[in-house]
Amino acid sequence: MSIKILSESEIKQVANSYQAPAVLFANPKNLYQRRAKRLRDLAQNHPLSDYLLFAADIVESQLSTLEKNPLPPQQLEQLNAIEPLNAKTFKRDSIWREYLTEILDEIKPKANEQIAATIEFLEKTSSAELEEMANKLLAQEFNLVSSDKAVFIWAALSLYWLQAAQQIPHNSQVENAENLHHCPVCGSLPVASIVQIGTSQGLRYLHCNLCESEWNLVRAQCTNCNSHDKLEMWSLDEELALVRAETCGSCESYLKMMFQEKDPYVEPVADDLASIFLDIEMEEKGFARSGLNPFIFPAEEA
C-alpha cells in the first residue's frame, strides 16, 4: 500500500512542510448528519424515494447509536503503519454486535413487512453466525451474505470502524503512486470519489465504504488499475453532471466521481445511491463497478 499512517516521531519530522493530506479522516457525528439530510433531500420526487428514506433511517440510527454507545478507547498501539485497521486482519471488538442490536431496535418501529422479517432473522441469529457473516463481508465475499442482511451488518461494522479510525494517528504521507484502489486505513473498497473545494480545491479523494476515510488519488488515473489510458467520463445529464462515471477501457471498470464545486452538499454514499440509474447505464455498456455502496450489495449466490 502506498499511503502510510505516520507515528508521532514521524509527524514531527514533517511538521514544517505543508502538503495536501494524503488521508482525510471523517468527523463521525457531522458525517452522519450530512448523509441523512442529503438522503432525505435526494428522496424528494425520486423514483426510489422509499429506499433512500430507508437508508436515511439507517444513517440516523447509526448517529443515535454513536451518541448513546460510543466506542471505548481501544488497544491500538502495535498496529501496522500500512492499513492499520485492515478489515480482514484487524481484531475487532464484539461491541459491533451491540451496535447491530441498537440499529435494529431503531429501525424496527418503521419497518415494512420485508424489512421486519430481516430484522427478526438477525435478532435470532447467534453471535457466532453474525461473526461469520461479518467475516465474509469484510473479506469482500459479498455474494455469500444476502443483501438484505448485509446492509444492517455493514452499518454496524462501519460504525465501529469509523470510531476506531478516530483513535489512530491522523497524519499520513504517500509512499508511492501504486495500489491506491483500496483504503489505506482499513483496506476496504471506495464508494466513489469526490473532487474537493476549499483548501483541497481540485484534488480527488476516494471515500471508503467501511471506515469512511478519504484518500487522495490524482485525477486522470484509473481508480482500479492505475492506468492513464482509455479513460472516459459519462453522465446521464451533461448539463447537470454533478455525478459522473469514470470508465477505464484497460480493466473495463468504473467508479463514480462527484464535484463539490457543482454542489457543496454532495455526499458520496447518498449521491452514489441516488444515481443508481447511471450504474445501470454503465453495466449495459459492459463496465463493472470497482467500488461498493453500503446500501447496494450484490445478490447472494444461490
UniProtKB/Swiss-Prot annotation:
One of its GO terms (cellular component) is cytosol. Signal peptide: none annotated. Its main location: cytoplasm. The keyword Cytoplasm applies. One of its GO terms (molecular function) is ferric iron binding. CDD domains: FdhE. It is found in: Cytoplasm. One of its GO terms (biological process) is protein maturation. Keywords: Cytoplasm. It comes from the Bacteria. The keyword Cytoplasm applies. Belongs to the FdhE family. Necessary for formate dehydrogenase activity. HAMAP family: FdeH. This is Protein FdhE homolog. It comes from Haemophilus influenzae (strain PittEE). The lineage of its organism: Bacteria, Pseudomonadati, Pseudomonadota, Gammaproteobacteria, Pasteurellales.
